[in-house]
Curated annotation (Swiss-Prot):
Keywords: 2Fe-2S, 4Fe-4S, Biotin biosynthesis, Iron, Iron-sulfur, Metal-binding, S-adenosyl-L-methionine, Transferase. It comes from Ruegeria pomeroyi (strain ATCC 700808 / DSM 15171 / DSS-3). [4Fe-4S] cluster binds at residues 55, 59, 62. This is Biotin synthase. Belongs to the radical SAM superfamily. Biotin synthase family. Pfam families: BATS, Radical_SAM. Homodimer. It comes from the Bacteria. The lineage of its organism: Bacteria, Pseudomonadati, Pseudomonadota, Alphaproteobacteria, Rhodobacterales. Binds 1 [4Fe-4S] cluster. The cluster is coordinated with 3 cysteines and an exchangeable S-adenosyl-L-methionine. Binds 1 [2Fe-2S] cluster. The cluster is coordinated with 3 cysteines and 1 arginine. Pathway: Cofactor biosynthesis; biotin biosynthesis; biotin from 7,8-diaminononanoate: step 2/2.
């Protein structure tokens, strides 16, 4: 089923998709997926925290925020570029095609640390891997420098809908996020941009977040769908975990409205069984974060994933 590529979705349209009977929704999404992607092609991306903790932002879900003093987390300074590249090489040997590097910063500052990040990007690209970073807010000249270093994609999530956003984050505006994404796109960097479900948002909030993403022109190269991992010491520590059908609905709807985008299963994936994850792939997911740790949270291990992909007959992306 070849869906037209659109960037004019309304929130009502997206919400109507989210509310479809589940099997109808998954069936439609699978048709769209097969029209644009090989169904057994699942990209593996590895994610490393290159600077951990002490972030001045107040994101309610994040254990790396300096505002959440009860979280048990060891702060770590920015890693050495050579060490990061060696870890990228190890991830590549384990099957990862993309290496993503995250620094717990509010925004990038020019200087030695940014120069080191640029060296990391160049080193990862020299391995033949795709390189992605998430560093907080950028200015236009910094996006240009990242592009010149060979950066494949910049991750900067919207997190949730514009309407619900203020209940989760108070130190950075929604427009700040959109501005950084625009600077990256202007520099020729692909966008990796998604959000989180399970923070107390409504179904309409989920639809509104997807609508913002689907109305980018062109659509983001990849859209990570995260299920909240409640972390003790954060304001969302006692939120109920997301059920699999909520995640499947998000994946399927993202696939229908963004046919060419890689839809990535991200945080919270390890909560779900192999059969539940397979349902997400049937609904259109075609990328995962691969490895034992996802920044500071546990992730499905490479051994379990190898068994899963073997059972699915999934191919490695070239």
């Amino acid at each position: 089923m070849a869906e037209a590529i659109r960037s004019d979705w309304s929130v009502d349209e997206v919400e109507a998709l989210l509310r479809l009977p589940l099997l109808d929704l998954v069936g439609r999404a699978n048709g769209v997926h097969r029209a644009h992607h090989a169904p057994d092609d699942i990209q593996k991306a590895s994610l490393l925290s290159i600077k951990t903790g002490g972030c001045p932002e107040d994101c309610a879900y994040c254990p790396q925020s300096a505002h959440h003093r009860e979280v048990e987390l060891t702060r770590e300074k920015l890693m050495n570029p050579d060490h990061v590249v060696s870890l990228a090489r190890r991830a590549q040997r384990a099957g990862a095609e993309r290496f993503c590097m995250g620094a717990a910063w509010r925004q990038v500052r020019d200087g030695a640390e940014f120069d080191n990040v640029l060296a990391m990007v160049r080193g990862v690209r020299a391995l033949g891997m795709e390189a992605c970073v998430t560093l907080g807010m950028l200015r236009p000249h910094q996006a240009q420098r990242l592009a010149e270093a060979g950066l494949t994609a910049y991750n900067h999530n919207l997190d949730t809908s514009p309407e619900f956003y203020g209940q989760i984050i108070g130190t950075r505006t929604y427009q700040d996020r959109l501005d950084t994404l625009a600077y990256c796109r202007d520099a020729g960097i692909e966008l990796c941009c998604g959000g989180i479900i399970g923070m107390g948002e409504s179904l309409r909030d989920r639809a509104a977040m997807l609508q913002v993403l689907a109305n980018f022109a062109p659509h983001p190269e990849s859209v990570p769908i995260n299920a909240l991992i409640p972390i003790e010491g954060t304001p969302l520590a006692h939120r109920e975990r997301v059920g699999i059908f909520d995640l499947v609905r998000m994946v399927a709807t993202a696939r229908i409205i963004m046919p060419l985008t890689r839809v990535r299963l991200s945080a919270g994936r390890s909560d779900f069984s192999a059969a539940e994850q397979a349902l997400c792939f049937l609904a259109g997911a075609n990328s995962v974060f691969y490895g034992d740790v996802l920044l500071t949270a546990p992730n499905a291990g490479t051994g379990a994933d190898a068994e899963l992909f073997a059972a699915l007959g999934a191919l490695e992306t070239a």
